[in-house]
Structure formats: C-alpha cells, structure tokens
Amino acid sequence: MTDLTTLTIAQARDALKKRELKATELTEAYLKAIELANPILNTYVAITAEQAMKMAAKSDSRLAKGHGGILEGIPLGIKDLFATQDVHTQACSYILDGFKPHYESTVTANLWRDGAVMLGKLNMDEFAMGSSNETSYYGPVISPWRKKDSNEKLVPGGSSGGSAAAVAAGLCVGATATDTGGSIRQPAAFTGTVGIKPTYGRCSRWGTIAFASSLDQAGPIGRNVRDCAILLKSMASFDEKDSTSVNLPVPDYESYIGQSIKGMKIGIPKEYYLEGMSPEIVELWQKGINWLKEAGAEIKNISLPHTKYALPAYYIVAPAEASSNLARYDGVRFGLRIPGKDVIEMYENTRSVGFGNEVKRRILIGTYVLSSGYYDAYYLKAQKVRTLVKRDFDQCFSSGVDAILTPATPTPAFGIADEKIKNDTVAMYLNDIFTVPVNMAGLPGISVPSGLSSNGLPLGLQLIGKPFAEEVIFQIAHIIEQAAGMFSAEKWWT
C-alpha cells in the first residue's frame, strides 16, 4: 500500500475528490508520522490532533456531497508566527508563554476557508530571527537530511526550519512559512523542498507576528513547485486589515506549470559570483543555466551593482523595525510576566528573561541605529541603499529580463552548534547573502532543489521575478525541477 505521507498536495487532492482516500485517513497517517518523528526532529511545538481529526471529518462530509475547496482535506503545518484562534501561538519565544489568540490570521483563515486541515504549530527561530532554527525557545529542529556516512545532526535552515523539515520528513503535505531576509528560501534549499517568497503585499500580514514590517512576507513550503502554486493560490488575497496588502487578482498559479519558457530572457547577475564561493555552487548554477537554455530560454548577463551593500543595509533596517515591533512585549497584557518591585522592574525582568540572546542582540542593534545621532548615519543611509538595490532590479526587468537565476545559498546545510558559525555572528548572517536583496526590493523569489553536494546534501537555485509575477517564476522553476529530478531524505529516524 502507498505510504500516504508521500503523496503530494496535487495527488492527495485528486484522490480525495475521487473518494479513493478519506481526509481522516490522510490526517491520521500524518499524526502517526508526527508521533514517531517529532521527539527526534522537534519540528512541531504544538500538535493539534483532536482539532485536526474534526477538521478532516468535516472535509470528508463536504467531499461526500461533491463540495469542497481547493485544499479540502489537505493536512498542513503552520509556522508558529501565524495567529491561530485558541491555539498556541508564541513565535517560539518564552515571552509569549501560554499565549493563545482569540483571532485567526488572514493567511490561515484563507487556508481553512479552502478546506485545509491544521496538524499543529511548527518550530522556528525565535521571532523569526535566525538562519538555523537554533534560536527557538523549544530547542533546535534537526534536519531530516544527513551527510553521506555521517550521523552529524544538521540544521534545516531558518527561520522557517520547522516548516521545511516537516515537509521534507513527510510530517505534513505542505506548510506555511514567512520570509524577511530568506527565511523561506534558505531552509527550502537546505532540505530539498520548494519555497516561495511572494511579492511584498501579495499575502496579508494581518495576524502574523511582526519581525520587520516592511520586509516580512508569508509564503508556502511544499514538496514540489506545483504544490507551492496550489498553496499560494489559497494563501494570497487582498486584505483591508493590512495597509500593505495589494488589491490585485490572484492568478491560477497551477495553470502555468508545464508551460513553455521558450523566448523568455533569464538574467545572470555577475555580482552573485562571490570570491571563494564553493565550486559545487558555481557548477550547480551553470547546470541551471544550461537547463533553461535547453528549454528555449535566452540567457543574458546582467549587473546588479548594489547587491554587495544589501546585506549590511538589511542588518540595519530589519533590527530597527524589530526593536520597534518588539517593544509591545512588556509582560502587561499577554504572555510572560516576571514580577518586580515596580512596573519598570517588571518590564526589565520580563524582557531580560523572556527574550533569547539573538532577539536581544537585534533589539539592541535596532535601538542603537534609531537613536539620536546615529539615525542619519545608519538608518537613513541603509534606506537609501535599499532604494538603489530596488532600482538595480527595476532597470534589469525594464531591459526585457523575465526572471533572474542565482544560487539560493552559498553552502549546503551545516551542523547544529557548528563552532565556526556559532562563534561568528556575521558568518551566520552571510547565509542570507543571496536572498536578502530580494526582500529589500520587495520582489518574489523561489528556491528549487537542483542537485546534491558531494556529501549528499540538497542544493537549491533561486529564481527572482518581477513584482506580482509569481506565475512566471513557477513556470520557470518547474523546468528546473523537471531537469534536476526529485530529492528525498532517507528516514533514519524510523
């Protein structure tokens, strides 16, 4: 019998509609898989088994009557950054200990409207600040991938490490995630999954716990390009409750899968060839170029001259916004409260105990760059750099380029508590060097599994598209996926 947890969203959807499979059977299979794997991989921080079975039973009832949404009966994992009504929502931080919101985020409400089933809340870096899922209050997520002939525990990437690892390990059919500087695309690349960061404004941010409001964007992680296209169709919408939400029609992304890319122009930015970059990454990039050429695309060398300034500018803009957003967590209204002799001491006690080290670091950086005397020198200058980064992309796309192809990450996944990365914050931040410019410009970007490293770990390529042209990068990503083949981790934890 087919292992139900290996079905893609498209396969499960078709089987459910034909009544060859029940939503309750599919959900139960995932809950059993989670029960077995979660003590080892630590992907879920809350498992909503009872609620999942009730949602699945309702899906079966609708399907039996010939009704049902585009995700009817599909079991999903939800990143712990999305508010889920009366269910654990803590951004994997101690400061939100015990918080259960009385409202639903717009993104998750859209998924439930379309019939999806919630399996639980997924682990992540605390407040989405991290690139390895090691900053979570609930401990690190263990990647389902291992190097050849090694038992070393690897990171799944971050901040959406739980989402990527759960999809890769077969612990949900797909997952929600968020991307502020690469938090969908980097973990997708590290785990052999597909992850898309949509254009800023495509998915509502309402009910999603904020990190950096001008950069945060929700998106899906799935097993393949088609699954991500199906998920994004549901997640994306205009929302009056989010002032940055854009009122544009949401295309049928799935209909673009399999269409020809003949005649499309693909830009290759020279600035992404970094000094000392792994030859494996360069070789993978060249393979991607060749695959697109063979599919009829035209390759065009381009320049994005301000790319090298994007990462340092990001680490001024993002912490500045984070320091402002996280000021609301004071122990007064919700979450953790550590008493003190007066209200000031209560604030200090709560925030010093409630926030982890990486979050504290970014709050301090943000407070510093926004302080009097440094605002002009750092924050305003970083915003000017951001404008230049965006202008580079605009000029490239206005010259006729349809999409840009780059590596997704400079290396494959590294070890948990890797000493070199652990003792060098900048080395950790450099994991996002290829992804951050996309956020700074507000563009859509997708990571597609494209090969394996010499030690058997997944490597990804990134496609960057024009604003609100996610369908084009889905179309091109599918070509890469078909050429590269599919990659899956061996289930060493069973």
UniProtKB/Swiss-Prot annotation:
Signal peptide per UniProt: none
Alphabetical list of Pfam families matching this protein: Amidase
BP term (GO), one: translation
InterPro entries for this protein: Amidase, Amidase_CS, Amidase_dom, AS_sf, GatA
Enzyme superclass (EC): ligase
Gene Ontology CC, one term: glutamyl-tRNA(Gln) amidotransferase complex
Record-annotated active site: 79 (charge relay system), 159 (charge relay system), 183 (acyl-ester intermediate)
Keywords, ordered alphabetically: ATP-binding, Ligase, Nucleotide-binding, Protein biosynthesis
Function: Allows the formation of correctly charged Gln-tRNA(Gln) through the transamidation of misacylated Glu-tRNA(Gln) in organisms which lack glutaminyl-tRNA synthetase. The reaction takes place in the presence of glutamine and ATP through an activated gamma-phospho-Glu-tRNA(Gln).
Family of the protein in this entry: Belongs to the amidase family. GatA subfamily.
Database matches in PANTHER family: GLUTAMYL-TRNA(GLN) AMIDOTRANSFERASE SUBUNIT A, TRANSAMIDASE
Protein's UniProt name: Glutamyl-tRNA(Gln) amidotransferase subunit A
Organism: Bartonella henselae (strain ATCC 49882 / DSM 28221 / CCUG 30454 / Houston 1) (Rochalimaea henselae)
